[in-house]
Swiss-Prot record:
The modification N-acetylthreonine is found at T2. The keyword Metal-binding applies. This is Photosystem II protein D1. Residues 345-353 form a propeptide. InterPro entries: D1/D2 (IPR055266), Photo_II_D1/D2_sf (IPR036854), Photo_RC_L/M (IPR000484), Photo_RC_L/M_CS (IPR055265), PSII_D1 (IPR005867). The record marks A344, T345 as: Cleavage. It is an enzyme of class 1 (oxidoreductase).
Length: 353
């Protein structure tokens, strides 16, 4: 009899736990994805803060030339970064217990791999948690689908690109200047500015910013007047009121006269779907571009594509970009190799014995 009571009590405890985890009445929804998201993101954030402040220099290139990235080793907020895991480790799984000591783990950049893997798992669970809450509230799944764009972008630069290049040392450093360094080296090695998927991403980000600003300014300008013309229209409203405060027909008419009739939306749902889809699709394409360039399917190469009647090269903008790429590449990892691959290849002219 005691066993039955204990089992019933434990089942009730587990049932209450399940109800609490999946309850939509909590101030912050947890969900089953949240059970994994919370510890992974807390771990990634904690290790990031500690490493950004106090991590010792990391031998990123695997040539016994450590690079300092933390605040206590001479960096500031702008120059500081979590240095990627050493090229000596490559793509190996490198938890703390695989190193001979904590000092060795830090020297080889173990914190970077720990942070990145926990972070990617955490943001993926955050996306799943968005879907889970939407499902329980009877909503459609578009919020999680939209969030998949930044998740795909982060996965591309922190995981897919290192896999394609063969080492976590090629991943994006976790810092401001480290991000810029990653962008410069990426351009030098893959000519990303000439990749059509990157161009679509630029159109998505800048276009999304433009459309967001246009929509916000139209909405805040198209107030339904609740006062006389001698009073401010703002007096007719309370901040946070439930009643609708703007007229989409008026906004549609204004914008249609500003450009042309069919340049504006007269349907609110179509408008907001467009505002969501434009940047999301653009960032999807950028993540796909990074993932293809990870395996060296690079941007277009139009170098020396224009010649005169005598075969002399007429430089175009593509040749200027190529020259800049070579300059950036020759300065990158200058002690790790004698020449970049592009500069080390040449044709041997035939000679008569």
């Amino acid at each position: 009899m005691t066993v039955v009571l204990d089992r019933r009590k434990s089942e009730n405890l587990w049932g209450r736990f399940c109800n609490w985890i999946t309850s939509t009445e909590n101030r912050l929804y947890i969900g089953w994805f949240g059970v994994l998201m919370i510890p992974t993101l807390l771990t990634a954030t904690s290790v990031f803060l500690i490493a950004f402040i106090a991590a010792p220099p990391v031998d990123i290139d695997g040539i016994r030339e450590p690079v300092s990235g933390s605040l206590l080793y001479g960096n500031n907020i702008i120059s500081g970064a979590i240095i990627p895991t050493s090229a000596a480790i490559g793509l190996h799984f490198y938890p703390i217990w695989e190193a001979a000591s904590i000092a060795e783990w830090l020297y080889n950049g173990g914190p970077y791999e720990l942070i990145v893997l926990h972070f990617l798992l955490g943001v993926a669970c955050y996306m799943g948690r968005e879907w889970e809450l939407s499902f329980r509230l009877g909503m459609r799944p578009w919020i999680a689908i939209a969030y998949s764009a930044p998740v795909a972008a982060a996965t591309a630069v922190f995981l897919i690109y290192p896999i394609g290049q063969g080492s976590f040392s090629d991943g994006m450093p976790l810092g401001i200047s480290g991000t810029f360094n990653f962008m410069i080296v990426f351009q030098a090695e893959h000519n990303i500015l000439m990749h059509p998927f990157h161009m679509l991403g630029v159109a998505g980000v800048f276009g999304g910013s433009l459309f967001s600003a246009m929509h916000g300014s139209l909405v805040t300008s198209s107030l339904i007047r609740e006062t006389t013309e001698s009073e401010s229209a703002n007096k007719g409203y309370k901040f946070g009121q439930e009643e609708e405060t703007y007229n989409i027909v008026a906004a549609h008419g204004y914008f249609g006269r500003l450009i042309f009739q069919y340049a504006s939306f007269n349907n609110s749902r179509s408008l907001h779907f467009f505002l969501a889809a434009w940047p999301v699709i653009g960032i999807w394409f950028t993540a796909l571009g990074i993932s293809t360039m990870a395996f060296n399917l690079n941007g277009f190469n139009f170098n020396q594509s224009v010649v005169d009647s005598k075969g002399h090269v007429i430089n175009t903008w593509a040749d200027i970009i190529n020259r800049a790429n070579l300059g950036m590449e020759v300065m990158h990892e200058r002690n790790a190799h004698n020449f970049p691959l592009d500069l080390a290849t040449f044709e041997v002219s035939a000679t008569n014995a």
